Amino acid sequence: MSFTSIFIALLYLGGFLIILVTASAVILPLLITSLFFATGVVLCGFLSNKSYKLALRAYNLATPHTRSSLQAAADHLAPLDSVETVSPKEELLHKIHHFYKKSDSNVRTPIVVSGSEIPKSVIKVSEGT
């Protein structure tokens, strides 16, 4: 090997080492910072999962007690016979009827039949009605 080739090889090796040290000086702090934040994310995820499971367990333990308390309170209330309750289906039909009644006065009121009102015999309906 000649002196010139050894010198050029050492020059390339020196340049490589300088670039390596410079890149390491820039990348290593960023890599350490990234590792720190990634550890924080994993730790927060773990704590979030544990707190969720703890809250879910507390909820599951409290739900039967709450239901029994509400049922006991409801048992002490007198039934309201004078108030007519409207099912959501009937309320929706009522709203639809009033919506169409504003635009067209020929729309008929919907007929709502509950299960107890259905007759056991067949009713014949004529077309002229």
Curated annotation (Swiss-Prot):
InterPro entries for the chain: Osw5
Listed transmembrane segments: 2-21, 25-47
A GO cellular component annotation in the UniProt record: membrane
Location(s), subcellular: Membrane
Pfam families xref list: Osw5
Coiled-coil stretches: none
Residue intervals annotated with topology Cytoplasmic: 1, 48-129
Membrane topology: Multi-pass membrane protein
Keyword Transmembrane in record: yes
UniProt topological domain (Extracellular) ranges: 22-24
Family: Belongs to the OSW5 family.
Known role: Involved in spore wall assembly.
Protein name (Swiss-Prot/TrEMBL): Outer spore wall protein 5
The encoding gene: OSW5
